[in-house]
Amino acid sequence: MKNLLDLEHKLNYYFNDRNLLKNALLHKSLGNERKEYKNQTNERLELLGDAVLDLIVAEYLYKSYKNASEGPIAKLKAMIVSEPILAKISRQIGVGKFLMLSRGEVMSGGRNRESILADSFEAILGAVYIDSNLDEARVFALSHIKQYIDHIEENEDILDFKSILQEYVQKEFKTVPTYELVAERGPDHMKEFEIQVIVGNYKEKAVARNKKKAEQLSAKALCIKLGVKYNEAL
């Protein structure tokens, strides 16, 4: 087995009880192959780590998106804690070469299998939680997953910008935004809609494949123009 200190460097976490890290890396295939490892596999730590990760990510999103409803937050959370993302984190760390697998699992490519890598990251997080506390586990998890949260945030619609804009405009301008269809372009199966939102002398346009999306995009653009603070982390 590779030097665990090397892995701790990459994890940026040093265990008080390194046996926890060993257990987090011990796959059930080896437990099935060798009886002495049967009760030391990472499945229990994986279960715990899964719950800890759910809490950490849900808490982060709750604090970061004050104006988002439950639905978009749940969608974003599911994407962040998904198997492909967790496997990518494990690959980036290099977890695969430290895994304790059965010979058959090694021969079949287990060190690079997405499901095994994702489960292993959850098991390591569970081990960090047991070895320290929730605060340390939170720092550990976010240090590895934050870049993926940022990437997903940039490419997903999380906030209801129409509601945010309306709330702001009612408070500051004592009116409500109006939306108008500027143009429709393209054939029926690839139609695009250009929508303009108007608040007094302020106007912004956006184009999308459906009217609701175009309205959201135009509202977002006007929020930015007006300096609306719609995504403040606590």
From Swiss-Prot:
Entries under Pfam families matching the protein: dsrm, Ribonucleas_3_3
Q: Does the keyword Mitochondrion apply?
A: no
Record: active site: D50, E122
Task: Give the UniProt entry's GO cellular component terms.
Answer: cytosol
Q: Name one GO molecular function term.
A: metal ion binding
For this protein, the record's CDD domains field holds: DSRM_RNAse_III_family, RIBOc
EC number in record: 3.1.26.3
Q: What does the record give as cofactor?
A: Mg(2+)
GO biological process: one example: RNA processing
Compartments reported by the entry: Cytoplasm
Give the main location: cytoplasm
Q: Where does Mg(2+) bind?
A: E46, D119, E122
Q: Which reaction does it catalyse?
A: Endonucleolytic cleavage to 5'-phosphomonoester
Question: Where in this chain does the record put each DRBM domain?
Answer: 160-228
Assigned keywords, A-Z? Cytoplasm, Endonuclease, Hydrolase, Magnesium, Metal-binding, mRNA processing, Nuclease, RNA-binding, rRNA processing, rRNA-binding, tRNA processing
Q: Where is the RNase III domain?
A: 4-133
Q: Which PANTHER family match?
A: RIBONUCLEASE 3, RIBONUCLEASE III
Q: Which family does it belong to?
A: Belongs to the ribonuclease III family.
So what does this one do?
Digests double-stranded RNA. Involved in the processing of primary rRNA transcript to yield the immediate precursors to the large and small rRNAs (23S and 16S). Processes some mRNAs, and tRNAs when they are encoded in the rRNA operon. Processes pre-crRNA and tracrRNA of type II CRISPR loci if present in the organism.
Q: Assembly and interactions? A: Homodimer.
UniProt-recorded name of the protein: Ribonuclease 3
Q: Which organism is it from?
A: Fusobacterium nucleatum subsp. nucleatum (strain ATCC 25586 / DSM 15643 / BCRC 10681 / CIP 101130 / JCM 8532 / KCTC 2640 / LMG 13131 / VPI 4355)
Q: Which gene encodes it?
A: rnc
